Amino acid sequence: MKKIDRRTFLGNGVAAAAVITAGKPFDAKGNNGPVPLKKNNEDPFNPVTFSAMPTNSFGRTGYKVGILSLGGQATLEIKGREEESEKIINRAIDLGINYIDTAASYGQGVSQLNIGRVMKTRRGEVWLSTKTHDRTYDGSMRLLEESLKNLQTDHLDLWQLHNVQRQDQVDQIFSADGAIKALEKARSEGVVRNLGITGHFEPLVLLEAIRRFPFDSILMALNAADVHYLSFRNYLLPEAQKQGMAIVGMKVTTRSRILSSWTPPPLDQQTDARLRTPKPGTINIREALTYNMSLPVSTTILVLMT
């Protein structure tokens, strides 16, 4: 089978096509129908991935993940967009996406519900990842139960601490009744296979967290503008790479702000003073993705608003 390099992949536009239109699922033999669910200790397998895009090792786990993955925000977290969401998810899997990332807080559970309707029949095809935003043991265990129910699965491939921003949050997470105890218990019971942490505000806080605990993965903001302010590439990426963690990139376009196609709203409608600007960005989506993939990332999360 001919290997597809990153340049060819991006040039063919598969990155955009993977989440636009719906199609029927295929099993490993190319027949219409769902791929059977895997056992909790087995990696999922999408038969299309290896011919659709390059893959990378997901850190120390041994899983081969496609270089592009589907995120559970935008359309997927909006109530009333169930049909569109299911089409996006199914089409993404059909075209080789084998990693889906969501969170308990996305759309107050709507994202997990939308993904769960597809996972009911296609769980065996994708690495399924979600997050807890609670910093305590009890709160995180409650969220885990809710996530499993909404995602219609009995296990997660990855459970992550969501958007850790401040040192006091790190201290609470690692306290006697902190969320890290929930992550460890869930993994020891086989409900969760791997543990991760995420964030897109303060790289030095995340650096402290990954020095305290051997997480399997880290989801961080990585984009062409990152080096200019609170740089994840400069402050966090080297340590994550040194530890052999799976590195997942997000915020590739900084919510479109670095794209030349972005039209800034009037300044008085831009509520975040840190991001206020009268000018569009300077690069296109292909350049944004190419930059991200030049870094040592396992996969890059994309979302779609229809």
Which role does the model predict for each range below?
Residues 69, 99-101, 157-160, 196, ...:
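Conserved beta-strand positions in the central sheet of alpha/beta enzyme cores
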Residues 61-76, 160-163:
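N-terminal small/glycine-rich loop or linker at the start of catalytic domains
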Residues 116-129, 181-185:
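Alpha-helix-loop-beta-strand connector modules within alpha/beta enzyme cores
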Residues 23-68:
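C-terminal segment of N-terminal export signals and the immediately downstream linker at the start
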Residues 111-120, 140-152, 170-177, 201-214:
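Distinct, well-ordered alpha-helical segments
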Residues 58, 70, 100, 115, ...:
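Conserved, mostly hydrophobic/aromatic
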Residues 45, 164-306:
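Beta/alpha (TIM)-barrel catalytic core signal, keyed to glycine-rich beta->alpha loops juxtaposed to Asp/Glu
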Residues 1-17:
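N-terminal secretory signal peptides and thylakoid transit peptides that target proteins
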